[in-house]
Amino acid sequence: MQLNGIGKHSIRFLSDKASRFVPKGGVYPKGFMVGGIHCGVKKDGKSLDLAILTNTHGKSAVASAVFTTNKFKAAPVQVSSKIVKEKKGEEINSLVVNSGNANAVTGSQGMKDAQDMITVTDSALGNPTNSSLVMSTGVIGNNLPISKILSGIPQLAGGNLGNTHEDWLNCAQAICTTDTFPKLVSKSFELNGHTYTLAGLAKGAGMICPNMATLLGFFVTDAPVSASALDQILKFATDRSFNSISVDGDMSTNDTIVAIANGAAGGELIDNTASSAESFGILQREITGFAQQLAQLVVRDGEGATKFITISVKNALSYGDAKIIASSIANSSLFKTAMYGNDANWGRILCAIGYSQVSSGDSINPAKTNVSFIPSDGSSKLKLLVNGEPEVVDEKRASEILSVEDIEVEIDLGTGGGQECKFWTCDLTHEYITINGDYRS
């Protein structure tokens, strides 16, 4: 990542992020191996740029994936989505990822390169054809240095995979581009008398806007779950996590979120039938919370960001309307720059609410709308607007609330609908311009 023009204070802040958010250890699912190496995609000659994750359990795994909605879908997105669709999520065991080049808008050669990455990975791991999915991230419009990648895959698969914390960190680092720290989360949970484990990695710092953008994420579990149930759970979880974040309002060509389950920890199969309803609900809750934790790390690492902002919309007529309103605020450059400047300009919040494209005119009633800042120290909320009437705001307290890293804005629509949504974003700073102005240099 280029740091030209970024001051010493900002560099210290970025380093502090890494120390706070990169785990010193973790718990990892049974039956998976991961790793990352430098194969030559990145120009500096040393940064990790090739990652593999694979199922080593005796039985084949199941997978689900959610892909970008951008019309210019990158070659790896097209190839991987076809495999998931044709195999209905069954017998997908591995992921291969390169960073530094997106393999997007690269024509027929890009499609061939993406398929070749899968073919060589399957061969190196001893898996049947099309048992892997492929991801790429980086600069758009350049062909991959494919010979370097195809030479690197057997090297990585042949002796550089493992299940230690270091292996998982290497894998997380190998998918980064402008990220200032690798994003890795893991946890264990109890279900039906068994202990199951989740581990996840994500990449993203810029071009983050629903529905996903320059965002790669994958998480795996050793819980036993059917392909159809995993697909339903992933879509629910993604809608409330990776599709509920925004950094800069740009949507990428390469977004991919993948979940893989191998059942290595044993137990009864969890599916989406009535007999599994309770177990399905618990697993969905665990995966959704886990996905939110991983997605929030992407926002915390937003390019140039100094603030982590939670937007809570309450008492909406529907979850969909609550999310539309929250997204409208999160993508407002005026709102984001106000947060950077510790400016309690709630008029910008109302403006974004007012132009949001909600499904019904009844969803927003100016005379019932309430806006507040929720302090991170647990003290009483600072009311800015109550039932459409402005409050006399203590500007000093408002500035103090906005001066810390974690900020929450609460919007109570007062419709009585009871639906709510949380959405996460960051501020917009001078450093964002510097980073993106230097991206290809």
UniProtKB/Swiss-Prot annotation:
Its main location: mitochondrion. Pathway: Amino-acid biosynthesis; L-arginine biosynthesis; L-ornithine and N-acetyl-L-glutamate from L-glutamate and N(2)-acetyl-L-ornithine (cyclic): step 1/1; Amino-acid biosynthesis; L-arginine biosynthesis; N(2)-acetyl-L-ornithine from L-glutamate: step 1/4. One of its GO terms (molecular function) is L-glutamate N-acetyltransferase activity. InterPro entries: Arg_biosynth_ArgJ, ArgJ-like_dom_sf, ArgJ_beta_C. It is found in: Mitochondrion matrix. The alpha and beta chains are autoproteolytically processed from a single precursor protein within the mitochondrion. Substrate binds at T177, K203, T214, E303, N436, S441. Keywords: Acyltransferase, Amino-acid biosynthesis, Arginine biosynthesis, Autocatalytic cleavage, Mitochondrion, Multifunctional enzyme, Transferase. The keyword Oxidoreductase does not apply. It catalyses: N(2)-acetyl-L-ornithine + L-glutamate = N-acetyl-L-glutamate + L-ornithine; L-glutamate + acetyl-CoA = N-acetyl-L-glutamate + CoA + H(+). Its EC number is 2.3.1.35, 2.3.1.1. GO terms for cellular component: mitochondrial matrix. The record marks A213, T214 as: Cleavage. The record marks T137, G138 as: Involved in the stabilization of negative charge on the oxyanion by the formation of the oxyanion hole. The active site is at T214 (nucleophile). GO terms for biological process: L-arginine biosynthetic process; ornithine biosynthetic process. Transmembrane segments: none annotated. Belongs to the ArgJ family. This protein may be expected to contain an N-terminal transit peptide but none has been predicted. HAMAP family: ArgJ (MF_01106). Catalyzes two activities which are involved in the cyclic version of arginine biosynthesis: the synthesis of acetylglutamate from glutamate and acetyl-CoA, and of ornithine by transacetylation between acetylornithine and glutamate. Heterodimer of an alpha and a beta chain. This is Arginine biosynthesis bifunctional protein ArgJ, mitochondrial. It comes from Debaryomyces hansenii (strain ATCC 36239 / CBS 767 / BCRC 21394 / JCM 1990 / NBRC 0083 / IGC 2968). The lineage of its organism: Eukaryota, Fungi, Dikarya, Ascomycota, Saccharomycotina.
